[in-house]
Amino acid sequence: MGIAFFAGGCFWGIEAGFQKVPGVINTKVGYMGGHTIEPTYQEVCSDTTGHAETIALEYDDTAITYRKLLEIFFSLHNPTEVNRQGPDVGSQYRSVIFYTSPEQKEEAEMFIAEMNQSGRYHAAIATEVVPAETFWPAEEYHQSYFLKIGQRYGRSLF
């Protein structure tokens, strides 16, 4: 069993992108990387807490590798944008890999180096690689947001 934490724009889309991935057991959205204890969504959106909108993933490390999770994460957002993703602007939307072990740190740094050398992106990768801190779960209405909306409209959005 493994755990991974990623931030890359609005957490709704990142979570939805991982929810149907074989080997991903559970997802939860929340906040990490800031200085405010038990932040609320409104506080995080004020761009004063230092937190990033983050997804926590529990995964079966015998079914999916951390590298594969990194590949999926990079496919779900633009890792070259600084403090934004598309129309969403602010430090809460920054791209971050929060590692939980030296192995995750090394894997993330190697992956970013490979992506920078690949020419796949028009600019250098801006994704931060920093130690995981306290993960503060977001309010319940944010959890599995797109699955809830999709069900309301009778279809899944992802």
From Swiss-Prot:
InterPro entries: Met_Sox_Rdtase_MsrA_dom, Met_Sox_Rdtase_MsrA_sf. Disulfide bonds: none annotated. It is an enzyme of class 1 (oxidoreductase). Pfam families: PMSR. Its EC number is 1.8.4.11. It comes from the Archaea. SUPFAM superfamilies: Peptide methionine sulfoxide reductase. Keywords: Oxidoreductase. The active site is at C10. GO terms for biological process: protein modification process. It catalyses: L-methionyl-[protein] + [thioredoxin]-disulfide + H2O = L-methionyl-(S)-S-oxide-[protein] + [thioredoxin]-dithiol; [thioredoxin]-disulfide + L-methionine + H2O = L-methionine (S)-S-oxide + [thioredoxin]-dithiol. Gene3D superfamilies: Peptide methionine sulphoxide reductase MsrA. GO terms for molecular function: L-methionine:thioredoxin-disulfide S-oxidoreductase activity; peptide-methionine (S)-S-oxide reductase activity. Belongs to the MsrA Met sulfoxide reductase family. Has an important function as a repair enzyme for proteins that have been inactivated by oxidation. Catalyzes the reversible oxidation-reduction of methionine sulfoxide in proteins to methionine. HAMAP family: MsrA. This is Peptide methionine sulfoxide reductase MsrA. The gene is msrA.
